């Protein structure tokens, strides 16, 4: 089973909310996806804006606890890939990601103006994959059960809320005593194989028609 990666490239601006410990962060950047419909970890042609906010609490001068919420979008379209153009599949999904974790800096920004850092944690995210039908109308894919989820053998209907493991790293700069700027690359290894609504195989068209109607077959 191929799991998905939710990749976020962030430019982060933390503002110190207190003189020593707590920082409020705001950030913007790009979100991307890797999975059954996209084998590259990052492709600018299918990247989307992402933004969010969070809190960073300094446990020590190098170790911090972080809590973020990120709003983004992931998608893939075979029309943009010469390799997969004949397959002609596509999807798009908004993603809301809430993450708790720890961040470790190699150096203290109280002593230096620059430090690399890494982070890891746990996140809970929501998604809702959709595609366009033959008339160009947006259709949400989960209710269609195109792989028989919910009615075929042991294929259970998947939840639109899942857990993931976030991890990554970046470089942080102390612009002043109260403002820090960070450039960060992060991934989310998801706990679902249905971020793009593709996992195993499609079921028989007649069986799909009987259970979910003509729209699912189309």
Residue ranges with predicted function:
Residues 45-49, 94-98, 114, 161-165:
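Residues that define the transmembrane beta-barrel architecture of outer-membrane proteins
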Residues 22, 62-65, 178-181:
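Repeated loop/turn-to-beta-strand initiation elements of outer-membrane beta-barrel proteins
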Residues 19-58, 129:
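Short glycine/proline- and aromatic-enriched beta-strand/turn motifs that initiate or cap beta-hairpins
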Residues 26, 53-57, 100-104, 120-122, ...:
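Residues on the lipid-exposed face of transmembrane beta-strands in outer-membrane beta-barrel proteins
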Residues 63-145:
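Gram-negative (and chloroplast) outer-membrane scaffold detector with strong preference
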Residues 176-218:
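Predominantly the C-terminal beta-signal and adjacent terminal strand-loop region
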Residues 34-42, 83-91, 151-157:
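Extracellular loop and loop/strand-boundary signature of outer-membrane beta-barrel proteins
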Residues 19, 60-62, 107-111, 174-176:
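Outer-membrane beta-barrel channels and translocator barrels
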């Amino acid at each position: 089973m191929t799991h998905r990666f939710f990749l976020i490239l962030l430019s982060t601006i933390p503002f110190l909310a207190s003189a020593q410990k707590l920082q409020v962060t705001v950030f913007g950047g790009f979100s991307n996806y890797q999975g059954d419909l996209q084998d590259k970890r990052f492709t600018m042609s299918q990247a989307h804006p992402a933004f969010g906010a969070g809190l960073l609490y300094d446990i020590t001068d190098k170790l911090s606890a972080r809590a973020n919420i990120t709003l983004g979008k992931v998608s893939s379209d075979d029309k943009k890939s010469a390799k997969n153009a004949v397959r002609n599949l596509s999807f798009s999904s908004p993603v809301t990601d809430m993450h708790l974790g720890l961040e470790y800096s190699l150096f203290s920004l109280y002593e230096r103006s620059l430090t690399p850092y890494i982070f890891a944690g746990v996140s809970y995210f929501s998604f809702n994959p959709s595609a366009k039908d033959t008339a160009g109308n947006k259709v949400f894919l989960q209710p269609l059960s195109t792989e028989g989820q919910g009615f075929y053998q042991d294929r259970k209907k998947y939840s639109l809320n899942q857990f993931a493991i976030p991890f990554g790293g970046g470089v942080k700069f102390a612009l002043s005593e109260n403002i820090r700027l960070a450039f960060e690359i992060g991934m989310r290894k998801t706990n679902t194989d249905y971020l793009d609504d593709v996992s195993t195989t499609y079921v028989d068209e007649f069986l799909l028609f009987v259970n979910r109607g003509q729209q699912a077959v189309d």
